[in-house]
Curated annotation (Swiss-Prot):
GO annotation terms (biological process): aromatic amino acid metabolic process; dopamine biosynthetic process
Alphabetical list of CDD domains matching this protein: eu_TyrOH
Family listed: Belongs to the biopterin-dependent aromatic amino acid hydroxylase family.
Protein's name according to its UniProt entry: Tyrosine 3-monooxygenase
E.C. numbers: 1.14.16.2
UniProt keyword NAD present: no
Species: Schistosoma mansoni
Signal sequence coordinates: none
Cofactor: Fe(2+)
Pathway annotation from the record: Catecholamine biosynthesis; dopamine biosynthesis; dopamine from L-tyrosine: step 1/2
Record's subcellular location: Cytoplasm, Perinuclear region
Primary residence: cytoplasm
InterPro entries hit by this protein: ArAA_hydroxylase, ArAA_hydroxylase_Fe/CU_BS, ArAA_hydroxylase_sf, Aro-AA_hydroxylase_C_sf, Aromatic-AA_hydroxylase_C, Eu_TyrOH_cat, Tyr_3_mOase, Tyrosine_3-monooxygenase-like
Length: 465
């Protein structure tokens, strides 16, 4: 028999190990894991009452101390080979708590006569931290320095002191920005506006022949409501407010290329980290790093689309609490979809990736015989090697955004994880929940929807077609 512990403290038998999450505030905590081994339970012990009582006591202690219970799993670890078929159980608990509370819990467990052993696993280091509330994104600004103009001798701005100083001045806006602030405006120079205008005009001319329908629709909305034109560079706050009304996404300024872990974590909260600086004027049609032109011309038209915004968020959610290897696979998926994805549309190949739609050279490469086009397969795309400096050698072609979402969900659901991050749009928080509790909540939601439909049909003259 295996036990399922639920938040309402009910207990039910099933044939799978399972989990429970409770959420309480515990400041200054770190993640700790404990394996608890129990004395064997004999066949004669009615309903395993002593084991069940101990589990209740452990949960009650955690609740009373207001510890954040991340994961709770029980399973039989050993069936003793004797006539009575005695069973030994173990319990895995993952908590967010400070060192003092963990010591107190350890002493409490040691005093329980039904526990045979306690194994404290190595504490997870700070890199295992992930944001729980949208305000935690203030901590997700770890920059990758590989493309900084002051460090890379082949960067077009390396020998341009004025350009480097300009980049530093704009970067200060991002470093000073905090959750809840309005995004400060940047007064762009004539040279920066001219660079923007060159790319804007060049790329808009190929929309009809190369861009997917979702991109074109989004771009036209931005022209209408966010002052997209070749004569001025739109401000992030204006785009942020409009995008939040259309797809629920927001923007926060960033000083440069952030780490994949921090960038994906932002997407989980429907937040896009966006640069405000403009690429060097000497190379307007290609940039070695994300810049405002890449973000505004490449990404924003697609993020206005609700389906594509959902896909981006689901990628981000999958990254929370993931290992470094999983982060690498997810960021590679992002690269071959959101950045450099192609799609089929009415029998034609069209571009949906921001890296293609913000770089004329990349667009030419994507639609030439110099690159390979493969049907999108999520398992292949997740491990495909790519070039983060030059033009891509391979692109993946998806059937639609919806099919891309389906593949991503299947990919996540087959990961084998017992807990899944769930975003609450009302409180703008993320909670780790077991698959069991998610199914339970979904069933409850479906019942409520059916009830509303039943009420609507019973109190109106409407009849089903």
């Amino acid at each position: 028999m295996k036990m399922t512990m639920m938040c309402d403290e009910s207990i039910e038998e099933n044939n799978k190990s399972s989990t429970v999450e409770l959420n309480h505030n515990e400041k200054d905590g770190r993640i700790h894991s404990i394996i608890i081994n129990f004395h064997p339970i004999t066949h004669e012990q009615s309903n395993n009452q002593f084991y069940i009582q101990t589990l209740h006591e452990i949960l009650k202690y955690i609740i009373d101390k207001k510890l954040n219970l991340v994961h709770f799993e029980t399973r039989p670890t050993l069936t003793l080979s004797n006539a009575n078929r005695d069973v030994q159980y173990s319990c895995l608990i993952t908590l967010e708590a400070n060192e003092i509370n963990m010591s107190l819990l350890y002493e409490e467990l040691r005093g329980n006569s039904f526990i045979s052993g306690i194994n404290l696993l190595n504490n997870q280091e700070s890199e295992d931290w992930y944001p729980k509330h949208i305000s935690d994104l203030d901590k997700c600004q770890h920059l990758l320095r590989k493309f900084q103009p002051e460090l890379q001798t082949d960067h077009p701005g390396f020998h341009d002191k004025v350009y480097r100083e300009r980049r530093e001045a704009i970067a200060k806006i991002a470093f000073q920005y905090k959750y809840g602030d309005r995004i400060p405006e940047v007064e762009y120079t004539k040279e920066e506006i001219e660079t923007w205008g060159l790319v804007f005009t060049k790329m808009k001319a190929v929309h009809a022949s190369r861009a997917c329908r979702e991109y074109i629709d989004g771009f036209q909305l931005l022209e209408k409501y966010c002052n997209y034109n070749s004569e001025s560079i739109p401000q992030l706050q204006t785009i942020c407010e409009f995008m939040h009304r259309t797809s629920g996404f927001r923007i926060r300024p960033v000083a440069g290329l952030v780490s994949p872990k921090d960038f994906l974590a932002s997407l989980a909260f429907r937040v896009f980290q966006c640069t405000q600086y403009i690429r060097h004027h000497s190379r307007p049609m290609h940039t070695p790093e994300p810049d405002c032109i890449h973000e505004l011309i490449g990404h924003m038209p697609m993020l206005v689309n609700r389906q594509f915004a959902d896909f981006s968020q689901e990628l981000g959610l999958a990254s929370l609490g993931a290992s470094e290897e999983e982060i690498t696979r997810l960021s590679t998926l992002y690269w071959f979809t959101v950045e450099f994805g192609l799609c089929n549309e009415n029998g034609e190949t069209r571009a949906l990736g921001a890296g293609i739609m913000s770089s004329y050279g990349e667009l030419e490469n994507a639609f030439s015989d110099l690159s390979v086009k493969e049907p999108f397969n999520i398992n292949d795309a997740a491990v495909q090697v790519y070039d983060d400096v030059g033009y891509q050698k391979i692109y993946f072609v998806t059937e639609s955004i919806e099919s891309m979402k389906r593949e991503l969900r299947n990919y996540i659901n087959t990961s084998g994880k017992s807990t899944i991050p769930i975003y609450d749009p009302i409180t703008e928080t993320v909670h780790m929940k077991s698959r069991f509790s998610i199914r339970k909540e979904l069933l409850k939601h479906v019942k409520e929807e059916i009830g509303q439909l039943d009420t609507l049909l019973n109190h109106s003259n409407y009849t089903l077609p």
